[in-house]
Amino acid sequence: MRPRPCSILSLDVGRRRIGLAGCDALGISVTPLAALRRGRFDADLVVLQAHCCERSVQGLVVGLPLDAAGQPTAQAEHCQRYGLRLAAALDLPLAWVNEHSSTWAAGEQFGLKGDRSGRLDSAAAALLLEQWLAEGPELKPAQQTASRSGAGAGDGGS
C-alpha cells in the first residue's frame, strides 16, 4: 500500500556518513541532499533539525541493512537505534525500508561506485525514499516502531 504523500527526509545511516534525500510534499520529486559527516549525535541533530525545518519535513524514512534472508545485521541494529533516537528528538514519525544492496544499486545506477564524497550515500538514500514512496509502509510514531522493528523493514509491521 502506498503511503500518504508528505515531505520526507530519508537517511542512509553509516558509521562515517549519513546519506540524505528528501521529497516534496506531494511525493513526486526525490532529491539527494548533501551527505552529513557523522559526529556526535547532538551535532548531527542540529544539522538534521535544520534540514527538517527548511524542508517542512513530516516524517523520516530510515534504511535498515538486512541480510539476503531479511534478517537484521549488526549495522541494522545501529541504524535502528539511531533512527529511533532521531525520530524521538525531532518528534517525527518514521518508517523503515530494507536497504539491502541499496548502496550497490545507487553506485550502478548513478555511476558512483567507490565514491567516498558522500554522493553515493545520498544517492542510496534517494533510492530508499523512492522505494518507500512506491511501497510504504505508513509512517508510525517512534514508540510504536521500537517494539516491532525487529520484524523486518518493509513488512508493514515495522
Swiss-Prot record:
Q: Which CDD domains match?
A: YqgF
Q: Which UniProt keywords apply?
A: Cytoplasm, Hydrolase, Nuclease, Ribosome biogenesis
List where this protein forms a coiled coil.
Answer: none
Question: Which EC class does it fall in?
Answer: hydrolase
In terms of one coarse class, where is the protein primarily found? cytoplasm
Pfam family name, one: RuvX
Q: Which InterPro entries match?
A: RNaseH-like_sf, YqgF, YqgF/RNaseH-like_dom, YqgF/RNaseH-like_dom_sf
Q: What is its EC number?
A: 3.1.-.-
Give GO BP annotations, semicolon-separated: rRNA 5'-end processing
The domain of life is Bacteria
Compartments (UniProt record) = Cytoplasm
Which GO molecular function entries does the Swiss-Prot or TrEMBL record give? nuclease activity
The question of whether rRNA processing is a record keyword is answered with no
- In this chain, the stretch annotated as Disordered covers 138-158
Entry's Gene Ontology cellular component terms: cytosol
Q: What does this protein do?
A: Could be a nuclease involved in processing of the 5'-end of pre-16S rRNA.
Give the family from UniProt.
Belongs to the YqgF nuclease family.
- Descriptive protein name: Putative pre-16S rRNA nuclease
Q: What is the lineage of its organism?
A: Bacteria, Bacillati, Cyanobacteriota, Cyanophyceae, Synechococcales
